From Swiss-Prot:
Family the entry assigns: Belongs to the phosphoglycerate kinase family.
Complex formation: Monomer.
Keyword DNA-binding (UniProt): no
One Gene Ontology cellular component annotation held by this UniProt entry: cytosol
Lineage, uppermost ranks: Bacteria, Pseudomonadati, Thermodesulfobacteriota, Desulfobacteria, Desulfobacterales
Organism whose genome encodes this protein: Desulfosudis oleivorans (strain DSM 6200 / JCM 39069 / Hxd3)
Gene expressing this chain: pgk
Keywords recorded for this protein, A-Z: ATP-binding, Cytoplasm, Glycolysis, Kinase, Nucleotide-binding, Transferase
Pathway info: Carbohydrate degradation; glycolysis; pyruvate from D-glyceraldehyde 3-phosphate: step 2/5
UniProt key word Cell inner membrane: no
Protein name in UniProt: Phosphoglycerate kinase
Enzyme class: transferase
Length: 396
């Protein structure tokens, strides 16, 4: 892909697709502006280069029609604060009003379009809507890695009509990190997969078995794997219909000589409650009336040892119900072990990213991805629609 820095943007209208799908409270105040901060380097560069910067994003799920609850106005205000310059807010994302606003822009001006999902054509990857977006710009920049797994009009079809397309700096960083970790990893390569459901991670597990030297499985999804090995997991959450698939993963790991690590002890309680009585037990001694809610201390040590000599680590999914302090120790221990390793480390997925921040080790992770679904699809070996679209339309 051609680098943004090789394109002359001075005086040009540049449409930047960002992901400003940020959490808002009841007063429409932003509670976490990480995604806005992540896009600032690209926007600042374009402003400094004298471009007329048109920023577009979605927010929430407004069902293809305007809804003031999902207005991007709060993000425009925050972006203006971060850039230390005014950011004008449009009333819509396409149409005569937007065209006239852009016509009045001077080099270095920034305009935020209203929520793309207020238009039904966005989610449908609609050609007419994509043409209307492309008509607003001379250069299209995609800096929204976190939505690059969705074939939406502003990510996919727009690249068919925009005169010039390029990835933004965040997109370049994301793809560079994943290229280093997944396409040409230094070995030993270890993947850590956690979270609640085998069903959501199964394609990733199946692909990772072709790539990794070691596979660590934790979180509630590990219960299904333990059950597949004949362990009685008490009242722990399992996906009965996927026990066969779990057995298949265990068998394939053995066939491919991938070291597979599962919990050897767990923290159990009779209910999901921060004040519930809890204890660490071996996985073969889980009480019939209890459920596993975190990995135990022996497992934390086992997983930590499996990471010590790793050269590449990719982690997606917590080891327990880490949002409750009572069941957070396992996830924090793994976060510390990942941070302590000498490996190139990539962490992604909302819960996992929150965990490394809460564990106080975020500054010692090589790369923290902004992508959730996009991160997972790369772990599945898929080509992301947004990335394929950029590759399809490149300046000669």
């Amino acid at each position: 892909m051609k680098s943004l820095k090789t394109i002359d943007v001075a005086g040009k209208r540049v449409l930047v697709r960002v992901d400003f799908n940020v959490p808002l409270d009841d007063q429409q105040q932003i509670t976490d502006d990480t995604r806005i901060q992540s896009a600032v380097p690209t926007i600042e560069y374009l402003v400094g280069a004298g471009a007329k910067v048109i920023v577009c994003s979605h927010l929430g799920r407004p069902k293809g029609k305007p809804d003031p609850v999902f207005s991007l106005a709060p993000t425009a205000r925050r972006l203006g604060e971060l850039l230390d310059r005014p950011v004008e807010m449009a009333n819509t994302c396409v149409g005569p009003d937007v065209v006239s606003r852009i016509a009045r822009m001077a080099p270095g001006d920034v305009l935020m379009l209203e929520n793309l999902r207020f238009h039904p054509g966005e989610a449908n990857d609609d050609d007419a809507f994509a043409r209307a977006l492309a008509a607003l710009c001379d250069v299209y920049v995609d800096d929204a890695f976190a939505v690059s797994h969705r074939a939406n009009a502003s990510v996919d079809a727009v690249t068919k009509y925009a005169p010039v397309c390029a990835p933004g700096f965040l997109m370049e960083k994301e793809l560079g990190a994943f290229g280093k970790a997944l396409e040409n990893p230094a070995r030993p390569f270890v993947a850590i997969v956690g979270g609640a459901k085998v069903s959501s991670k199964l394609p990733a597990l199946q692909h990772l078995l072709q790539e990794v030297d070691r596979l660590i499985i934790g979180g509630a999804m590990a219960n299904t794997f333990l059950a597949a090995k004949g362990v009685n997991v008490g009242k722990s959450k399992i996906e009965q219909e996927l026990i066969g698939e779990a057995r298949s993963v265990i068998r394939q790991a053995a066939e491919k000589k991938v070291e597979l690590f599962l919990p050897v002890d767990v923290i159990v309680a009779e209910k999901i409650d921060p004040d519930a009585d809890r204890q660490a037990v071996s996985v073969d001694r889980i009480p019939a009336d209890a459920m596993a809610l975190d990995i135990g201390p022996e497992t934390s040590r086992l997983f930590g040892d499996a990471l010590k000599d790793a050269k590449t680590i990719v982690w997606n999914g917590p080891m327990g119900i880490f949002e409750m302090e009572a069941f957070a120790a396992g996830t924090k221990a793994v976060a510390a072990a990942v941070a302590d390793s000498k490996a190139f480390t990539v962490v992604g997925g909302g819960d996992t990213v929150s965990a490394v921040h809460e564990a106080g080790v975020a500054d010692r992770i090589s790369y923290i991805s902004t992508g959730g679904g996009a991160f997972l699809e790369l772990m599945e070996g898929k080509t992301l629609p947004g990335v394929a679209a950029l590759e399809r339309n490149q300046p000669a």
